């Protein structure tokens, strides 16, 4: 395998011409582990940073992430480390798969050491206190570093099982897009490019809201017609909100929008779907979260997006109904009722002029 640097990339690299980029994934959850495994399988010099030293040592010995992906064997070349400085020094790309509530703190910690030419967020969420997207946080904490976001319908267990999947790398830098495609693209995992960073990021964050709604609906055994309404009205809400945030609503027609929405809303593998199902089955939020044992970004996103939508005067009835059900004790039937409000609005709203949406 030839030695290779990030800055050597000047054009897309064919799948059969892999060279050894140095990749680090920060965060040992299911998706971070899946992306690290893909990079290692593609021949990249790959590390995964995990806070707990014992867990990192166990992964290096067994090549299994027992907590998140116990049924899959990882590439033997993938190295787990618990030292953050070691993880980020002299690397070409840092992929950050840290929950949104800890994202900024980890970037602050790596700032003195980072020598990477690109930092890419894998996190689908919004920072609670500031309503900042992960790309905003990267720009604030690492202002000199090229950045991007990776998002799409990427259920980790399906990727690990080798099922054909795709994702989107969004960045203002063509070089960052090429580098991430080079590191992760394979015969079974296609990486598309985009320059609409906020659009791709919004799709990844907002769809978590509606996965919670679909999980609640599944617990009530809703029909296919109702599921279709949830999906399409969710897409309308997402596009309305995206326009107010300066994103291109047409981005939501791609993998990072409707693709991710469909996968997350229809899969029992989705954490947000699972927590919704638990809530619909009569459990409290605390009980559901404890039972899941992982972070469900959708719950935090519901709170943040509802507040921002009220501030911006964006009509988001499903999001409002979810908030009322989860935090105010309203009956889950309110979610279904939210689909039937507001008379005869246009079906495909995001193709209308903005003042008509």
From Swiss-Prot:
GO cellular component terms, semicolon-separated: cytosol
Catalytic machinery residues: 207 (proton acceptor)
Lineage, uppermost ranks: Bacteria, Pseudomonadati, Pseudomonadota, Gammaproteobacteria, Moraxellales
PROSITE patterns noted in UniProt: NAD_G3PDH (PS00957)
Residues engaged in binding sn-glycerol 3-phosphate: 124, 152, 207, 260, 270-272
Chemical reaction(s) catalysed: sn-glycerol 3-phosphate + NAD(+) = dihydroxyacetone phosphate + NADH + H(+); sn-glycerol 3-phosphate + NADP(+) = dihydroxyacetone phosphate + NADPH + H(+)
General function of this protein: Catalyzes the reduction of the glycolytic intermediate dihydroxyacetone phosphate (DHAP) to sn-glycerol 3-phosphate (G3P), the key precursor for phospholipid synthesis.
Name listed for the protein in its UniProt record: Glycerol-3-phosphate dehydrogenase [NAD(P)+]
Predominant localisation class: cytoplasm
GO annotation, biological process: carbohydrate metabolic process; glycerol-3-phosphate biosynthetic process; glycerol-3-phosphate catabolic process; glycerophospholipid biosynthetic process
EC number: 1.1.1.94
Annotated keywords: Cytoplasm, Lipid biosynthesis, Lipid metabolism, NAD, NADP, Nucleotide-binding, Oxidoreductase, Phospholipid biosynthesis, Phospholipid metabolism
InterPro entries: 6-PGluconate_DH-like_C_sf, 6PGD_dom2, G3P_DH_NAD-dep, G3P_DH_NAD-dep_C, G3P_DH_NAD-dep_N, NAD(P)-bd_dom_sf
Locations listed in the record: Cytoplasm
A GO MF label: glycerol-3-phosphate dehydrogenase [NAD(P)+] activity
Binding residues annotated for NADPH, in chain numbering: 30-31, 51, 124, 156, 271, 297
The keyword Cell cycle appears for this protein: no
Pathway of action: Membrane lipid metabolism; glycerophospholipid metabolism
Keyword Nucleotide-binding set for record: yes
Similarity-based family: Belongs to the NAD-dependent glycerol-3-phosphate dehydrogenase family.
